[in-house]
């Protein structure tokens, strides 16, 4: 039969370590206990009261144990408690002779012989002396040191505690002299019961508890207990309560060995509050894991996990790292593979094996599903040390930035700057498109203008025709007055024709606008609705909150629709006026043609005149087209120049934003982490990518120095203070050079080159310094320690962290003085699952759970059924079982730690020697 019962290890449970039974002379309403059945009935009521109160352990400590061994109720209570999982520790309360009769408790192992306990009690009184006189409990004639010696010689496992230390007959009942101080400092008394939680103590007792009283300063575990004299809740009398009404939360197995842990960890293993301590959100802790394997290679039973510190130990190649990596891969395979790649370790080939992770809220992740629903930090073996290698520095920077972003104020400022940079990049992309659109339009206008002909040649031809027409007019005998009239009418006709064409264009444009605006308005209104819907979904608004948002947007839409209605009405009126204007301009042309006709009729050679008129009309139209294109070309060139300037401004803005990011990354408020550790950041330019992307556009058999003085030997000499100048100067060179002279590689165009030039090649590189020493110049051990401190101790992340052998390259002294301290602090807020070979990380960090792994290699028959098997429990789980069916089941966690971990036995011994409990 397996002795592994509490697989999840040390958990918080309620303990009442000072309880009495009706054998106590002060018991209220003593029930009948004469017969066996009456004792059993009371024991059942006693246990029911304890379990209803949520107790996991009670210590029955009746005064002087009992007057008659046969009347003892402890066996009956233990018998009733066992099926319900309630542990009953036997013990007694006795008044030792020190300081006028100080009460102490002695608590024994649940496996202790009650007969031997009774014999111990007998030795505390002179032979033949009674323990009671009527209802009076008699004090022992022995002092506390004599009590300790008698207990030591009994061979029993025991703990001595000061009973109700701050009350009458307690060790701290009154401020005393050297004798009371000496009594309080007895090294073999490691527990003191108080009437109230330590934080509520006042006066002298508070000075003792807080360690400010020099005469009473010592390490001791404090507990509170009921000191019950009844099973029924009522008015506490003399600081006594009903069973379970006052108790202590203790983080340990519900066993005597579990109780011993509060001696070693007096501050971290006890707690005084109503609800269970150290409760983490259930979606942030893993409840259990299991291999889904039908091949017989891995055990199929689930492995429960403690929500605090879980350590995985075992010999070489026993499946420790396999278990850890399977957890990581089932939760986030991509992250696990990326971390493993950095660490340069190999992932175990799982073949068809599946793996399941169940979270405390009931969620399940499976390796086969490859769906990321939860977060976890995975630090495989050597990952921390590989991070500082040159090739992995981007990953280090990413990790350090993630750490900084856990600060809410930093994150808000960071997001603001990133949004600004993104806005600049969006605007830059738009401006580049606008720039090339203008360039295309300019080329189109130039081409069309050239197709119409040469402007100077057309103007010369018009002058020649005008001279010929003038000769015809003179030959027709026009008077000076007719000549002047003729010229005026001709000039007016030219103006009227120009006005008519303008009126036609404006009217046509207005009709186009009127036809297309309604669709644009409807599209805009629809997009506004889309924005509202996206904002509602993104922020998870409730219906009432959504209505508030919509009420504001409705007003905007109504304003747009009202403005559109006014615009439609105004433009309708305007079109009527424009139509009238076009008709008037047409009539003016007709009028001037009519006025000109009499003069034209007088010219003798009408055929030649008509030819001149037709040529003049055609050439004037062509010239007007050329002038229009020239005007359009000038406008495009102005916009083109403005676009280039806008691009240059955006390049400058982008650089300024990056500078502000670097300033944020170096702000002491966020980067001074304590312990003289400082995170710093420098601006970086991705030179290799720039040369590959941008310079790769060109035929580099020719020098790229024409792009500027910073381009030498087909490479770039980058300096942060020159960044904007380098990019903008190269841009000017590109766009001013005829495209056929750029020597672009086949398939490349000017647009490609500009796009690649204007990409964002700016980045940042983080580093860490301690007392001015850069992490990249530290020893591997110091590098690992600092990064572990950042990622584990200083991080605000609450999701689980999985670490494989963090002790690599770190000496034992540093592990104990630093790494253990980090882990102890963080395990309270964050589940830590850690593979280790170092006993200090198991015992020093006070691991709540130890998982022992074993591989049955080469058919040795060490395992019960599978090639890879695991057992788990708390470090207080201690036993040997030579009849067990496997190596793992043959001993407890303590024994496995001593066997598997080098120095494990010494670590246990030092832990206990510290408290004189060896």
Predicted regions span which residues?
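C-terminal lobe/lid and adjacent interdomain/linker elements of RecA-like ASCE P-loop ATPase modules
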Residues: 347-350, 370-374, 396-405, 816-918
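Extended, charged alpha-helical "arm/stalk" segments used for dimerization and assembly
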Residues: 363-447
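Conserved ABC ATPase signature
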Residues: 304-308, 312-319, 380, 766-790, ...
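Extended, charged coiled-coil "arm/hinge" scaffolds of SMC/Rad50-like chromosome-maintenance ATPases
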Residues: 444, 448, 452, 459-777, ...
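Pre-NBD coupling/linker segments of ABC/ABC-like ATPases
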Residues: 220-221, 243-290, 697-698, 703, ...
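Flexible phosphate/Mg2+-sensing switch loops adjacent to catalytic phosphate-binding sites
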Residues: 331-369, 640, 644, 648-668, ...
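Charged catalytic cores and adjacent phosphate/nucleic-acid-binding surfaces used
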Residues: 1-49, 53-55, 67-89, 94-115, ...
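Phosphate-binding glycine-rich loops of NTP-binding sites
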Residues: 58-61, 306-340, 784-793, 838, ...
């Amino acid at each position: 039969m397996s002795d592994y019962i509490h697989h999840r290890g040390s958990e918080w449970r309620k303990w009442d370590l000072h309880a009495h039974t009706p054998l106590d002379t002060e018991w209220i309403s003593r029930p009948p206990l004469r017969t066996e059945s009456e004792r059993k009935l009371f024991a059942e009521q006693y246990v029911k009261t304890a379990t209803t109160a949520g107790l996991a352990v009670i210590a029955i400590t009746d005064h002087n144990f009992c007057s008659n061994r046969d009347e003892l109720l402890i066996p009956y209570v233990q018998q009733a408690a066992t099926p319900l999982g309630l542990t009953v520790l036997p013990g007694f309360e006795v008044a030792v002779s020190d300081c006028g009769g100080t009460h102490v408790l002695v608590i024994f192992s649940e496996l202790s012989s009650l007969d031997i306990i009774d014999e111990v009690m007998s030795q505390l009184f002179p032979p033949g002396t009674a323990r009671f006189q009527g209802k009076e409990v008699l004090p022992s004639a022995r002092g506390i040191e004599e009590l300790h010696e008698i207990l030591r010689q009994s061979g029993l496992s025991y703990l001595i505690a000061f009973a109700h230390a701050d009350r009458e007959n307690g060790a701290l009942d009154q401020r005393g002299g050297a004798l009371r101080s000496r009594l309080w400092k007895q090294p073999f008394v490691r527990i003191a019961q108080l009437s109230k939680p330590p934080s509520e103590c006042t006066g002298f007792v508070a000075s003792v508890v807080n360690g400010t009283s020099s005469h009473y300063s010592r390490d001791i575990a404090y507990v509170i207990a009921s000191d019950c004299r009844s099973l029924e809740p009522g008015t506490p009398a003399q600081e006594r309560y009903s069973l379970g009404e006052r108790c202590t939360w203790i983080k340990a197995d519900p066993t005597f060995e579990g109780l011993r842990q509060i001696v070693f960890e007096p501050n971290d293993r006890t707690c005084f509050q109503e609800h269970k301590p150290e409760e983490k959100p259930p979606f942030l802790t893993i409840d259990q894991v299991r291999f889904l394997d039908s091949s017989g290679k891995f055990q199929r039973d689930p492995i429960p996990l403690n929500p605090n510190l879980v350590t995985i130990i075992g010999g070489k190649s026993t499946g420790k790292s396999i278990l850890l990596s399977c957890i990581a891969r089932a939760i986030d395979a991509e992250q696990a593979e990326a971390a493993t790649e950095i660490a340069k370790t190999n992932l175990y080939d799982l073949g068809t094996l599946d793996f399941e992770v169940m979270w405390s809220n009931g969620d399940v992740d499976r390796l086969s599903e490859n769906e990321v629903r939860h977060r976890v930090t995975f630090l495989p073996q050597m990952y921390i040390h590989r991070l500082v290698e040159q090739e992995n520095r981007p990953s280090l920077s990413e990790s350090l930035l993630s750490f900084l972003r856990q600060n809410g104020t930093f994150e808000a400022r960071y997001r603001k700057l990133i949004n600004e940079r993104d806005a600049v990049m969006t605007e830059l992309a738009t401006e580049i498109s606008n720039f090339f659109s203008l360039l295309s339009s300019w080329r189109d206008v130039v081409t069309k203008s050239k197709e119409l002909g040469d402007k100077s040649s057309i103007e010369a031809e018009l002058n020649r025709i005008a001279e010929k027409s003038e000769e015809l007019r003179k030959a027709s005998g026009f008077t000076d007055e007719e000549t002047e009239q003729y010229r005026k009418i001709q000039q007016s006709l030219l103006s009227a024709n120009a006005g008519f064409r303008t009126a036609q264009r404006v009217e046509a444009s207005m009709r186009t606008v009127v036809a297309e605006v309604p669709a644009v308005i409807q599209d805009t209104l629809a997009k506004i609705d889309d924005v509202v819907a996206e904002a509602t979904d993104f922020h998870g608004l409730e219906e009432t909150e959504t209505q508030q948002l919509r009420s504001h947007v409705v007003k905007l839409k109504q304003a747009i629709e009202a403005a559109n209605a006014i615009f439609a009405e105004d433009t309708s009126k305007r079109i009527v006026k424009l139509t009238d204007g076009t008709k008037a301009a047409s009539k003016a042309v007709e009028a001037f043609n009519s006025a000109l006709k009499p003069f034209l009729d007088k010219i003798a050679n009408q055929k030649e005149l008509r030819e001149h008129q037709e040529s003049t009309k055609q050439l004037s139209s062509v010239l007007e087209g050329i002038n229009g294109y020239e005007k359009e070309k000038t406008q495009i060139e102005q916009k083109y120049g403005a676009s280039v300037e806008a691009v240059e401004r955006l390049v400058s803005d982008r650089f300024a934003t990056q500078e502000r990011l670097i300033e944020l990354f170096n702000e002491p408020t966020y980067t001074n982490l304590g312990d003289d550790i400082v995170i710093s950041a420098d601006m970086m330019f991705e030179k290799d990518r720039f040369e590959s992307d941008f310079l790769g556009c060109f035929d580099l058999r020719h020098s790229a120095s024409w792009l500027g003085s910073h381009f030498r030997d087909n490479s770039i000499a980058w300096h942060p203070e020159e960044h904007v100048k380098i990019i903008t100067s190269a841009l000017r060179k590109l766009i001013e050079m005829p495209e056929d002279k750029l020597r672009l590689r086949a398939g490349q165009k000017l647009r490609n080159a500009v796009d690649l030039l204007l990409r964002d090649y700016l980045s940042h590189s983080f580093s860490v310094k301690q007392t001015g020493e850069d992490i990249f110049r530290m020893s591997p051990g110091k590098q690992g320690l600092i990064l572990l401190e950042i990622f584990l101790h200083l991080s605000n992340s609450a999701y689980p962290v999985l670490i494989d052998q963090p002790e690599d390259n770190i000496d034992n002294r540093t592990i104990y003085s630093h790494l253990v301290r980090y882990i102890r602090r963080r395990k309270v807020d964050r589940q830590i699952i850690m593979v280790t070979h170092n006993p200090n990380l198991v015992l020093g960090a006070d691991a709540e759970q130890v998982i022992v792994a074993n591989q049955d290699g080469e058919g040795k028959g060490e395992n019960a059924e599978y090639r890879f098997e695991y057992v788990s429990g708390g470090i207080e789980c201690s036993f040997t079982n030579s009849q067990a069916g496997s190596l793992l089941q043959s001993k407890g966690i303590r024994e496995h730690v001593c066997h598997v971990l080098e120095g494990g036995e010494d670590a246990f011994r030092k832990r206990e020697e510290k408290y004189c409990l060896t």
